[in-house]
């Protein structure tokens, strides 16, 4: 059965089910659309290029064949996926001057966006666990963070994220949309679609809060707990150089964690706000464009190993070690 069938209005009503949505986009003036197109295209090329460069460095550079960089490579794949789910479709709409998206395509975009964002939550938690073992239990680090454990953590992240995305998508498909169909955003997401539903969204919003607490709250608590132990261990290091190295490996990850969870809480924990849509556009740009574009810079800026590997890739040389 088509997902669209699930949202048809009840028999006996004169309302017509919405077959497509109109995404209003970032700007509605035609004069600004070419500017937005150029900026988004530039951001997409920079983001995909930067993250794929990080992935290539992790794959080909022996110095980066470590658990921390294994997770970083997976994070780069997620960043490419996140921006690819939203930006190319928007670029296509800007070129064709067609702002509509079918109902099924909207739900598909919703599913894949939450799949990738959910994986981010748990992958960042796995990276915090990796730093905890590396700094607090260095003698048993190699056995506790074996390749099998690494793959299991990534697989568990995927399974949890898939369950979360499927839950929200199925719950959304049970809502009725009878018009209006204008989404004040540039991609399909839960808060904006809730505003358009002609049936009650109380259960959906309750589900979003409950699952959001599990998907974001639990990883955030685990990350804070891990880094409290890491901070205590680092402060016990007598060598200034040792402290500096430990903080540098954790600083990049903490920056990404703050950016990721901060915008997630702002976006999904304030449903019901009448002025939410315009603010959500800015948050959406940060989620799908700026954050994935910044991550390669954040992780390579203070990491000489990553910088060296990137230079070797760009210059066409391989490390001999």
Swiss-Prot record:
> Where on this protein are sugars attached?
14
Q: Taking the first listed entry, what is the main subcellular location of this protein, grouped into a coarse class?
A: membrane
The record's keywords, sorted A to Z, are: Cell membrane, Disulfide bond, G-protein coupled receptor, Glycoprotein, Membrane, Olfaction, Receptor, Sensory transduction, Transducer, Transmembrane, Transmembrane helix
A Pfam family that this protein carries is 7tm_4
Q: Which organism is it from?
A: Homo sapiens (Human)
Please give the Gene Ontology molecular function terms for this protein. Answer: G protein-coupled receptor activity; olfactory receptor activity; signaling receptor activity
Q: What is this protein called?
A: Olfactory receptor 3A2
Family, according to the entry, reads as follows: Belongs to the G-protein coupled receptor 1 family.
Gene3D superfamilies assigned: Rhodopsin 7-helix transmembrane proteins
Does the keyword Membrane feature in the UniProt annotation? yes
Q: Does the keyword Transferase apply?
A: no
- Which ranges make up the Extracellular topological domains here? 1-35, 89-109, 168-205, 271-281
Give the InterPro entries listed for this entry. Answer: GPCR_Rhodpsn, GPCR_Rhodpsn_7TM, Olfact_rcpt
Entry's Gene Ontology cellular component terms: plasma membrane
Known function: Odorant receptor.
User: What ranges does the Cytoplasmic topological domain annotation cover?
Assistant: 59-66, 130-149, 230-246, 302-321
Transmembrane parts of this sequence: 36-58, 67-88, 110-129, 150-167, 206-229, 247-270, 282-301
Q: Which cysteines are joined by disulfide bonds?
A: 106-198
**In which domain of life is the source organism classified?**
Eukaryota
Q: Where in the cell is it found?
A: Cell membrane
């Amino acid at each position: 059965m088509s997902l669209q069938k699930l949202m048809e209005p009840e028999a006996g009503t004169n309302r017509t089910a919405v077959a497509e949505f109109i995404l209003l986009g970032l700007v509605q003036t035609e004069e600004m659309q070419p500017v937005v197109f150029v900026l988004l295209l530039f951001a997409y090329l920079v983001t995909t290029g930067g993250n794929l460069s990080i992935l290539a460095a992790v794959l080909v550079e022996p110095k980066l064949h470590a658990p921390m960089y294994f997770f970083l490579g997976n994070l780069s794949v997620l960043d490419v996926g996140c921006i690819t789910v939203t930006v190319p479709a928007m670029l296509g709409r800007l070129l064709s001057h067609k702002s509509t998206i079918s109902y099924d395509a909207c739900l598909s975009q919703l599913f894949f966006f939450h799949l990738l964002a959910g994986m981010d939550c748990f992958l960042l938690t796995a990276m915090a666990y990796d730093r905890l073992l590396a700094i607090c239990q260095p003698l048993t680090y190699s056995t506790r963070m074996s390749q099998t454990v690494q793959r299991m953590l990534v697989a568990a992240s995927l399974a949890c994220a898939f369950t979360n995305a499927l839950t929200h998508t199925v719950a959304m498909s049970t809502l009725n949309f009878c018009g209006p169909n204008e989404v004040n955003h540039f991609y399909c997401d839960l808060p904006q679609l809730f505003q358009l539903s002609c049936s009650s969204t109380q259960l959906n919003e309750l589900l979003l809060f409950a699952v959001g607490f599990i998907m974001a709250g639990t990883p955030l608590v685990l990350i804070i707990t891990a880094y409290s132990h890491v901070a205590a261990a680092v402060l016990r290091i007598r060598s200034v150089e040792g402290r500096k190295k430990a903080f540098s490996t954790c600083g990049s990850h903490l920056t990404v964690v703050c950016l990721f969870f901060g915008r997630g809480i702002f976006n999904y924990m304030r449903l019901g706000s009448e002025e939410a849509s315009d603010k959500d556009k800015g948050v959406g740009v940060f989620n799908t464009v700026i954050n994935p574009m910044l991550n390669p810079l954040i992780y390579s800026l203070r990491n000489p190993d990553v910088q060296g590997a990137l230079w070797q890739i760009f210059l066409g040389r391989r490390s001999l070690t």
